[in-house]
């Protein structure tokens, strides 16, 4: 069972597509670096929708898998 996405992962899923559309030949590592820098520059108020979505995903995950415990 996969862990639920956190706010950064929810946001980056949308943003990654935009970057890949603009620069289809860019390596994934470079895209990830850019996403990390852009996330850090976002204001907390800009992150709120993604935090709320991640919270919802976590609640759903907890309901679907009540005995889930992360084991790397």
Swiss-Prot record:
<dbReference type="GO" id="GO:0005634">
    <property type="term" value="C:nucleus"/>
</dbReference>
<feature type="DNA-binding region" description="HMG box">
    <location>
        <begin position="1"/>
        <end position="69"/>
    </location>
</feature>
<keyword id="KW-0539">Nucleus</keyword>
<dbReference type="GO" id="GO:0007420">
    <property type="term" value="P:brain development"/>
</dbReference>
<dbReference type="InterPro" id="IPR050140">
    <property type="entry name" value="SRY-related_HMG-box_TF-like"/>
</dbReference>
<dbReference type="GO" id="GO:0030182">
    <property type="term" value="P:neuron differentiation"/>
</dbReference>
<dbReference type="InterPro" id="IPR009071">
    <property type="entry name" value="HMG_box_dom"/>
</dbReference>
<dbReference type="GO" id="GO:0048593">
    <property type="term" value="P:camera-type eye morphogenesis"/>
</dbReference>
<dbReference type="Pfam" id="PF00505">
    <property type="entry name" value="HMG_box"/>
</dbReference>
<keyword id="KW-0238">DNA-binding</keyword>
<dbReference type="InterPro" id="IPR036910">
    <property type="entry name" value="HMG_box_dom_sf"/>
</dbReference>
<dbReference type="GO" id="GO:0000122">
    <property type="term" value="P:negative regulation of transcription by RNA polymerase II"/>
</dbReference>
<dbReference type="GO" id="GO:0000978">
    <property type="term" value="F:RNA polymerase II cis-regulatory region sequence-specific DNA binding"/>
</dbReference>
<protein>
    <recommendedName>
        <fullName>SRY-related protein ADW4</fullName>
    </recommendedName>
</protein>
<dbReference type="GO" id="GO:0001228">
    <property type="term" value="F:DNA-binding transcription activator activity, RNA polymerase II-specific"/>
</dbReference>
């Amino acid at each position: 069972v996969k862990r639920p996405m956190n706010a950064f992962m929810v946001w980056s899923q949308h943003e990654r597509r935009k970057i890949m559309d603009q620069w289809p030949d860019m390596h994934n590592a470079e895209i990830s670096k850019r996403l990390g820098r852009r996330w850090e520059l976002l204001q907390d108020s800009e992150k709120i929708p993604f935090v709320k979505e991640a919270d919802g995903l976590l609640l759903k995950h907890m309901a679907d898998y009540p005995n889930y415990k992360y084991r790397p």
